[in-house]
Amino acid sequence: MKKSLMMIAGLFFSVLSVAGQGLSMDRVNADFQKKKEALPTGDLFSVFRQQLTQEERDALTFFYAYMSVGDITDYSGDFYLENVRSSLTTRKETTWGKTIPDDIFVHFVLPIRINNENLDRARMVFHDELMPRVKGLSMLDAVLEVNHWCHEKVNYQPADARTSAPLATVKTAYGRCGEESTFLVAALRSVGIPARQVYTPRWAHTDDNHAWVEAWVDGKWYFLGACEPEPVLNLGWFNAPASRGMLMHTKVFGRYNGPEEVMYRTPRYTEINVIDNYAPTAKADVTIVDADGKPVADAKVEFKVYNYAEFYTVAS
């Protein structure tokens, strides 16, 4: 058995496939029809009977094609339509909106869900508060300003409960790294800036994990510590640890076909590897052989890092 791998700082992780480019609305529509057929009762798709522009219809179709059943049943169509309209309006009113490709917009601006938080009206609330602060700024400076705003609202405090919703995080004024990064992604998307939560499941240097944010600016992804403002992007306390990390990944809503390595696909999201943004990498091949030197078919390969007194599997 032969696997394609990528190496960083002497460690390996699995590369399962390489995605293509572009967004296929034909595929989105097909997935949407499957979702409708799977949920024939409850009138869960009634929002599509409203007067909608083609942009609104396409955006809602994308939402419903890849949302979980829980999100479809727990929140109304009007809730999703309000979020869609806010995102489309923001795209038109910002100077950077026209520079964002459609596939980046639908995967990294349009989606509401970031983690396992309850969904709320944060997009509209944050938009109204943040737009005056980012008006007239470049896209890069807007990212920095939004993070300053997040720092004003939320401080770090460790916790183990389910991820707090963005508006709940404002109310408590604290959150762990996963909540702070969820908060920053929600804030950036509210002003039309593509953003994604990045996660390393285990550090190589200490018994812990971490989550932070990447923002898309003028065609390139940059990282930043959530609610930890710095004067520039690609700077955080975790620069050195990330350069030694075994895996940095994010889950992208829908069928994403960007340039990053695809680790895993489900009917709802695409898990991608973004380790290239943190250290030089190289591809390597690992072949599993038996005692006679013959390749082993369907062998299970796991790549582990020592953390919390165990070898933790980060990819298999």
Model-derived segments and their meaning:
Residues 1-24:
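Bacterial Sec-dependent N-terminal signal peptides
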Residues 22, 128-135, 142-148, 157-167, ...:
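Hydrophobic/aromatic-rich core segments of domains that either
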Residues 27-172, 207-208:
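Secondary-structure boundary elements
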Residues 222, 307-315:
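Surface-exposed loop/edge segments in extracytoplasmic proteins
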Residues 255-275:
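Short, compositionally biased P/S/T/A/G/V-rich stretches that sit at domain boundaries
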Residues 282-290:
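A short, amphipathic beta-strand motif
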Residues 286, 301, 315-316:
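Glycine-centered loop-to-beta-strand initiation motif
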Residues 291-309:
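Short, ordered, surface-exposed loop/turn motifs in non-cytosolic proteins
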